[in-house]
Amino acid sequence: MPCLEIGYLPSLDFASNEAFNTLATNISYCGNDIKTILVTSRYAYEGKSFTCMNLLRTLASLQKRVVLLDADLRRSQIMSQHEIHFQGEKHFGLAHYLAGMCEMEDIVYQTNVPNAWMVPIGREVNSSLQLLSSERTRPLMDALRQHFDVVIVDAPPAGMIVDAVEMAKYCDGALVVVSYNRGRRKDIGEVVAALSKTKCRVLGSVLNNVDFRSFTSRNHYYKSERYASYYKRGYYAPKKKTKESE
């Protein structure tokens, strides 16, 4: 099996780590039939790829076999943001497979994170909708669903192009990432309405970039900080600033 090296996967602070643990738990409550999960947003740069990568890591740490499929064929950020490199001579990805240039086994990469696999885009394309709606998409999604416990699909922003809605046809559930103080209720409602037209079940939203200082009382905030620092001691020592992908 081909391999990918994830060079940058930053440590999370206590609050962020607990948030992803809660997200993973809530997904499990949605039922055993929810195996393929589409992650999208209304706008670009709301943190959907950041959410995908950390959900991948969290679920993998829970001994789930997880694969992340990068379906943002026009403007993928995962490879560059997380310093992901191919190991070996072949650099095939989703775009190559959908175009008939390689086979399914050529694009599923094992990573250096235990229990985590990835399907990269391979190359950016302009005709992304044409590729995603090809007859090769359904067999790929069915195979991934059969071989993995969870399939995470990093889709483009649903409010900008229709690729996310196309991919939703092949997914059991969807998460909408919303950046705090950026998304309007009307815009988010439009995304939910578009996804709901498919058979994909909208599981909920993920609120990202929240500044808890802006609405948490001073006394409660300090108590929360002391509680968090107790558990952070000894394992959280980030060396780089956190990069949030698209």
Label every model-predicted segment.
Residues 1-246:
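P-loop NTP-binding module
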